[in-house]
Swiss-Prot record:
Assigned keywords, A-Z: Cell membrane, Cell wall biogenesis/degradation, Glycoprotein, Membrane, Transmembrane, Transmembrane helix
Gene Ontology cellular component list: plasma membrane
Entry's transmembrane regions: 27-47, 75-95, 108-128, 162-182
The protein, known as: Casparian strip membrane protein 3
Record's subcellular location: Cell membrane
Subunit structure: Homodimer and heterodimers.
Sites where a glycan is attached: 51
Xref: InterPro entries: CASP/CASPL, CASP_dom, CASPL
Role of this protein: Regulates membrane-cell wall junctions and localized cell wall deposition. Required for establishment of the Casparian strip membrane domain (CSD) and the subsequent formation of Casparian strips, a cell wall modification of the root endodermis that determines an apoplastic barrier between the intraorganismal apoplasm and the extraorganismal apoplasm and prevents lateral diffusion.
Ranges of the Extracellular topological domain: 48-74, 129-161
Cytoplasmic topological domain: 1-26, 96-107, 183-186
Pfam families, sorted: CASP_dom
Native source organism of the sequence: Sorghum bicolor (Sorghum)
Membrane topology: Multi-pass membrane protein
Length: 186
């Protein structure tokens, strides 16, 4: 049997060095930040623009539901807005990590801040999810009626806005793991 090296052929593919892997991790970090920005921004906008009005007997008497009626949903909008602003402000550091993949202290700072933002977006999304559940199911013991039978488009929008927020939670978890892996390789 003749191997490819007997014919003078050599492999052109060199193994990927640490610099290439670190740069790849930094590029993935930047991409995940953009995805998380989109998720938190979409969630904040979807929830912040949610309202529905129902006529009651006449056109002069109406029932209205909007996100600002419930402080929990207001907290959800504020939490997603803060996390979105943080993610936008963290983009330059993420770009620095692509250029200088050896930056250690800035990556450590991002781990702590990403963890704090993960806690904030988790608190906002969890609180809003509880209210969305009550809006759909109600609570017989507390005599809270489900409102989604009447305000169906309101409930669809507040339920849909949770998707982006929970997606951003996953992205932040991945960002923390990526940064930890990048630091552990040093």
């Amino acid at each position: 049997m003749k191997g490819s090296s007997e014919h003078g052929e050599t492999s052109k593919a060199a193994p990927l060095g640490r610099g290439g892997v670190s740069k790849g991790v930094s590029v993935l970090d930047l991409i995940l930040r953009f995805i998380a920005i989109i998720g938190t921004l979409a969630s904040a906008i979807a929830m912040g623009t949610t309202n529905e009005t129902l006529p009651f007997f006449t056109q002069f008497i109406r029932f209205k539901a909007q996100y600002s009626d419930l402080p929990t949903l207001t907290f959800f909008v504020v939490a997603n807005s803060i996390v979105c602003a943080y993610l936008i402000l963290s983009l330059p550091l993420s770009i620095v990590h692509i250029i200088r993949s050896r930056a250690k202290y800035s990556r450590l700072l991002l781990i702590f801040l990403d963890a704090a933002m993960l806690a904030l977006v988790t608190a906002g999304a969890s609180a809003a999810a509880a209210i969305v559940y009550l809006a759909h199911k109600g609570n017989v013991r507390a005599n809270w009626l489900a409102i989604c039978q009447q305000f169906d488009s309101f409930c669809e929008r507040i339920s849909g806005s949770l998707i982006g927020s929970f997606g951003a939670m996953v992205m932040l978890i991945l960002l923390i793991l990526l940064s930890a892996i990048a630091l552990a390789r040093r």
